Every structure is written in structure tokens, then in C-alpha cells.
């Protein structure tokens, strides 16, 4: 099994859970000492370009590893899943991830809120703010969120 990254706590948990079940796990990383490296269940860290700095190089390195015959499966753990979907036409090895349209629908806070509305699932009241006039009638305090952000970045309480 090859993990798409090795620096997150998510990757560390995957390594532990899979390793305890006897799965041989390697992980890709652009840094020398990612957290997964310190698990007894991680056999190797495969150095690859950083997907944020060289997405094409990262896809090419992933494709080389997956077509080497050494791995039965690739497990995307974070944003790399989106990159594999967007770049699937550049890879010989097929990575089983959702189509890019599905990612766009759930990764955009606006599109996700619309999806919840379409499905009639409960969520806090929300409004798209594009112009200053869109602010009228808001009950403060409010939270403003960037359409795309992660881990609390792009969030402002006013």
C-alpha cells in the first residue's frame, strides 16, 4: 500500500491501522522526516516533489511508483485526492477517486451549502456575499468564510 502523503496525523493513523493488520505500507513525502516515518509500521518514505509546488512532478512520481508493480493500491489521504482526479488523464495508473466535478461540489463551501440545501439537510443559515449591499440585514456577529480554505484559515468573525 502506498499513501499519498506522510506528514499528517491522518497518514500516521492510516499507517498504524493498516500496519497492525499486516499491510505493508510506504508513504510519499517531499520532506525528509515526516511523522509517518517514525512509525514501526511504515516500511519506507518515497521522496517525491511537493504537490503544492510541483503538481505535475508529483503526479509523474506517483505514476512511476504505482506502475513499478511494487504497490497494489494507492490511498489518497488529503488534498492529493483532488489532484489525482484533476490529473488522472496524465497518469497511466488509474487512481480510484471521484470525478473532479464531485470534488468541486463538496470542497467549495458555497457549492457544499447549496448541495445541503438541495438535499434539504440542516445547516446554519447562510448567504453569499459578493457586494457591499449583500451585507444589509445581517444579524451580527457573523462568520465570513472564504470559498476554499482549510483548518480554519479563511474564516473571519465580524
Task: Spell out what each predicted region is.
Residues 1-99:
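ATP-binding N-terminal substructure of ATP-dependent carboxylate-amine bond-forming enzymes
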Residues 103-158:
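Active-site nucleotide/adenylate-binding loops and adjacent lid/helix of ATP-dependent enzymes
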